[in-house]
Amino acid sequence: LLNETTARRVAIRQPVKPGPRKVVEPIGVPVTGAKGERMLMQQYRSNSYLFGGNAPYVEELYEAYLDNPGSVPDNWRAYFDNLQHVPAVDGSDSRDVAHAPVVESFAQRAKANAFALKASSADLAVAQKQVHVQSLIAAYRFLGSRWADLDPLKRTERPKIPELEPSFYGLSESDMDITFSAANTYFSKAEQMSLRDILQALRDTYCGTLGVEFMHITEPTEKRWWQERLESTRSKPVLSVEQKKHVLDRLTAAEGLERYLHTKYVGQKRFSLEGGESFIAAMDELIQQAGAKGVQEIIIGMAHRGRLNVLVNTLGKMPKDLFAEFDHTAPEELPAGDVKYHQGFSSDVSTPGGPVHLSLAFNPSHLEIVNPVVEGSVRARMDRRGDKRGDQVLPVLVHGDAAFAGQGVNQETLALAQTRGYSTGGTVHLIINNQIGFTTSDPRDLRSTLYCTDIVKGVEAPVLHVNGDDPEAVVLAVRWSLEYRMEFRKDVVLDIICFRKLGHNEQDTPSLTQPLMYKKIAQHPGTRKLYADKLAAQGLGQNLGDDMFKAYRSALDEGRHTVDPVLTDFKSKYAVDWLPYLGRKWTDAADTAIPLAEWKRLAERITTIPETVNMHPLVKKVYDDRAAMGRGELRVDWGMGEHMAFASLVSSGYPIRMSGEDSGRGTFTHRHSVIHDQKRERWDEGTYVPLQHVAENQAPFLVIDSILSEEAVLAFEYGYAGSDPNTLVIWEAQFGDFANGAQVVIDQFIASGEVKWGRQNGLTLMLPHGYEGQGPEHSSARLERFMQLAADTNMQIVQPTTAAQIFHVLRRQMVRNLRKPLVLFTPKSLLRNKDATSSLNDFTKSGFHTVIGELNADVVAAAAKVKRVIACSGKVYYDLVKKREEKGLNDVAILRVEQLYPFPHKVLSAELKKFPNATEVVWCQDEPQNQGAWFFVQHNIHENMLDGQRLGYAGRAASASPAVGYAHLHQDQQKALIDAAFGKLKGFTLTK
């Protein structure tokens, strides 16, 4: 009705079609000049009905006109009369009517509830019940897993969850046979089901031995995917007879190995899998299904629990080789070695889709830290294959329930999962949930969440909880987990709830602290026995289980497998050849200089920025200066030295991967390897990376601004470098002080990985280090800790002090076929210190210097008069040179030790011999006496001194904190240590 009455009313508000404008001149206001024009417009706005502010007034006039045409002024009446001859908006000739009576009519009807739907009370009741049924369905999807039959020990009753009962929604027994719409479920092709059938279907699907959490996922497509998988099958696996026999075979192998080791090697640690044998069936299914889907490599990370079982029954390690390790007859070729349950292993196995390479990562006892290492290894393999989505490489991480919930590195690793620089296309997580962490089994002490898996909800990973005593449900859960990962490229978690038959290790007595749990365990017949009895009841043979067990035991007695799963003659074209890097020495020569013509060509390429890129003025200045440096017009600074090292390497075929919290720009804005267009209109576009445009066939250059994590990111890069010796992999700390946030990675992998496991790794660490008054958290990369870890030529520790030195040491890391971790203590103030710049000759006609000798020509000329030699490392050198100049001394020589480990004995000895009459050698450092290099270099310096020379120390006093927080105190300390370097020796000295 209102629409009809508005037929011409719209015309009142329609703008007049433009045409010749006639200005009606108000009396007494001449229209002349700009001022007059403005006054006219003001008059026009206040009088014109076209002005929006007058619309309510015009509407009111029009209402009055429709009610009584004579009630409005003549000029308005004439206008409204003419308006009635204009066709309505819908083209009809209907006449407008007043709105006011119509509006009032609607108001009265609303008061009288005249619009209420006329429906029977019976219809309303049915509709309400349908809504309640939908609520019940939603409740099972959300909460069903909490009522699932998941605990093999059945230690507690199922919790009471009112929302899963029909009565919670007002539904009673009388409603059970009423049919309701089931259109939003996948239980049946029928559109309707009785409430009884719906309830049974919900309980079968969500509350059996498999409980799935997926409703926390925000993407509707993924939720529907899970609903369809679960509801269409009622979560019930369908296995053929042969598949069931194969599952029993895997359970038999898992239990058989543990029983064999338990009786043959009594009391020896092996961290038994007993109670969690379904895990081996899960791994077997995962590998076979992954191979069928085109996966060609699976990288596995896991802790000690069940590891020996995986080595033998999953990866195909020969039982006799494992027994040799127990018997201590296995070859011991490594300097240190490691226990058997930390060992890694690689093999190639047959699957329906072809050979699959399996790799179990070496790992320490520090739980979960191997996870980001595995992810890094996977990313390296993906990059090598050009596998952008993770179609060919699959990461599989195996966790314990207590560690998964308790170790913070898991949160950091999950945070990497969907980022551009670290994504691996989704990880399959399997949790051996034996419901106990060492001696802790009370959930009130284990964690602060309902499930150990709750941390993954932050990345919206689905979780499948499954009863380990139902191996067929475990197999089904594995299939769905893999399908989800391959479909959506996201993490997925399979939580296998089982138990730990023995103690934490075989020397432990768990009933001391878990008497109730271990009474239950003592009464449990074992998963293999339960499943064998189930198959026997299905008519698959009463003696099937016993026959399999005897056959497996017999094979172990002979040190072999019942079926050899390993392909011995398969060689993937993507396998890495480490032979060129074996047996190398750190003293091997490396030509790191580049020809001048090549220098200029590369410099021009990395400083030629497209005109379409609108650079920030400060960044433009940096690149203009770099262009001048490339031409030899300016001395080369640190940022240019880095860039030229990178450019020369990628142009020679060495990929570069650099990551850190501010690596693109550099913490101290010296790098600018990523140029941001200042006029870009999209946040995800408008960057330009000059080092990606060095040559047409160059190797990749990737710089990543990482998430705010040290531990997981450094471990990831270690894993990457350990799988790709041809790539220069760099991790840069924002400040070196924060590197100890990843101390576990440094201690357990970087420092000791080679002597424990024989794993070489060329990872480079850049740790900004230097005492410049920024306090205890922004001064020290803890040089002393790396010096303490240095042994067996396990790493290289370098503190370069010039642009040329950083250029050569970065190139040396790749050009020389030695893959050892390189720890660079990089500067802060030296990044812009002109004294730290270098000439072109330093790049084109020189190399890396482990020790930089005296450079002052006057001191060198008067070498015989030198009485004191000051040795140092790092930026303190420039403070010492400045002080010597102030004092006008020519009898003091200053040496820089650029490489602190491996210590350059021959070079230092040669430098000291240049000053035969020196009686004193002083080690000067910025760091406190108990920190820095002093305690680790004094014996090396002493070894190379001349007879009769005394060695002393000049530096800060021992301190519990790396640096002071008071600026004035820092200055006082710095002045004192520089003065001490030139003053009388005090305190402890060593005489040769």
Describe every region a protein language model picked out.
Residues 296-460, 464, 668-724:
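Cofactor-binding active-site loop characterized by glycine-rich and histidine/acidic residues
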Residues 42-83, 87:
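Subset of Sec-pathway N-terminal targeting signals
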Residues 40-43, 50-51, 424-543, 547, ...:
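Thiamine diphosphate
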Residues 235-257, 323-375, 379-386, 817-886:
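Active-site cores of enzymes that catalyze phosphoryl transfer or operate on phosphate-rich substrates
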Residues 136-152, 285-314, 399-419, 489, ...:
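Conserved phosphate/anionic-ligand binding catalytic regions in large, soluble enzymes, centered on
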Residues 527-528, 534, 538, 542-656, ...:
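Hard-cation-handling environments
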Residues 83-279, 295:
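Extended, charge-enriched "interface" segments that sit outside catalytic cores
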Residues 140-143, 147-180, 184-192, 196, ...:
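Glycine/aspartate-rich loop-and-adjacent alpha/beta segment that forms the canonical ThDP
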